[in-house]
Structure formats: C-alpha cells, structure tokens
Amino acid sequence: MKKYLMMAFVAMMSVANVSAQNIPVGMRMEIGETERDKSEYSLFTYKDEDGTFGYYLSLGRVTKILGAIRDDITDMSFDDIRETSICLGGTKDEAFATLDSILALYNEELETSVEFQGRAVTGSGRLGEPATSQCVVKKNLVGGKRLQFIFTSGKRQVSTYLPKSVVKDLRRDLKIDVKLHPKQHR
C-alpha cells in the first residue's frame, strides 16, 4: 500500500513539475509582492497570446478619484487602467540586470530621466499594449530619492512612484524564487 501511495505521489509531483514550466497564456504568475505607503508592488511573469514570455514589475495600483483621469476637452474621462507595470526582460538574467539598473538610478542626479518599456493592466486583468514609460528621479519628501514612472496615453497621463526599498525587496524575492523553483524561470 505504501508503495502505491509513493508511486502516486511521485506521479503527481512529475505532473506538477511539467505544468509549472508551461505558464498559461494571459495568466499572471506572481513571484513576489510587497506593500509600502498603502501601495502594492509585485514582480510577476506573464505569457502573451503570441507566446512572448516576460518578467514584469508592477508599479502599484493607479490612484484616481472614481477611476477618472483629467482630460483637456471634457475635463474628466473614465479609464479602465488598474495598474501600471514595466517589462524587466524575457529571462531571469535580463530581469536581474534591469532591477540593478533601476537601483543604480537612485544614485543619479535629481530630474535624471530614463525610458522603460511599460504596459498598463486593464480592468480585465490582462496586460495592455506595450508603451514607453518615462522614469524621473525625484526627491523624497522625507529625504532620499524615489522614482516617478509616467505613462502617457494620448492626452492622458498616469504616474506612479517607486521607493528604493521596494526594488530591493522584490529583487530578493526573485532571487529566492529562482532558487526554490528553478524550472519555472528562463
């Protein structure tokens, strides 16, 4: 009886291991998550419908009053953008390199600007079309620096802030996840 239970357990683990390598299309697989100042930040992998795989850094929920963003014509419009994210790359090595380059930005002068490939997460939970986001080094209110990511879509503009401690925490989470689940990472 023990032999059959052990064989069933090994078979179940084999199936789980194979399925862990094949991420379903359009599904977000969380690697790490952290909260700061009432904002949630996360690191996740995502596979597009065309088969493109990538690591993404969620910059937190978009804070808007009732989901509205200012518009020049109507002065108010509704958008279904829930959160913004930037692409870290298609492999774990690219993701680590991008996280390291983001950490290096905190040592740059104020108002230094860099562009990142970003994507907005819509109300359906799926990533939208790739867009360029601008990252600007800003002074923190208490001291130190933080990064402001600005996403522009037509006349609309959404901005989010990223503290240094969040990047360090999520980099550590990625490092741990790569050690715990090496077959899930490319």
Predicted features and spans:
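Positively charged, low-complexity terminal tracts
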Residues: 19-186
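Sec-dependent N-terminal signal peptides
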Residues: 4-14
